[in-house]
């Protein structure tokens, strides 16, 4: 739970410099049909960290020296989604990240 707790704490409380230290130099983010490099992703995450955004219902699914998998809930345009994030780790840092959103039907 060490890395999971770290990510939740930094995303909810900052500072952004902590997140930067967790992101590998070779980092790539895959989202639906797009891809971001380290600088692009950190820029987007910086906006979240510096706003009042918070993880909602973060849930750890798996964590070991190779992978960190968790999900959380987001509301977008009045619809509720479960976002699952799969982080492949290299040298103790997030190296590849992929997310998937699943609509939650009440």
Mark where each language-model region is.
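A beta-strand edge to alpha-helix "cap/lid" segment located at domain peripheries
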Residues: 5, 12, 30-32, 36, ...
């Amino acid at each position: 739970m060490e890395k999971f707790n770290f990510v939740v704490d930094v995303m909810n409380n900052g500072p952004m410099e902590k997140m930067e230290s967790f992101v590998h130099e070779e980092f790539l983010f895959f989202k639906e049909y797009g891809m971001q490099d380290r600088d692009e992703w950190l820029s987007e995450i910086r906006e979240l960290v510096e706003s009042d955004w918070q993880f909602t219902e973060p849930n750890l699914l798996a964590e070991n020296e190779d992978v960190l998998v968790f999900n959380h809930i987001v509301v977008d345009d009045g619809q509720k989604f479960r976002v699952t994030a799969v982080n492949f780790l290299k040298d103790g840092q997030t190296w590849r990240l992929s997310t998937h959103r699943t609509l939650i039907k009440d």
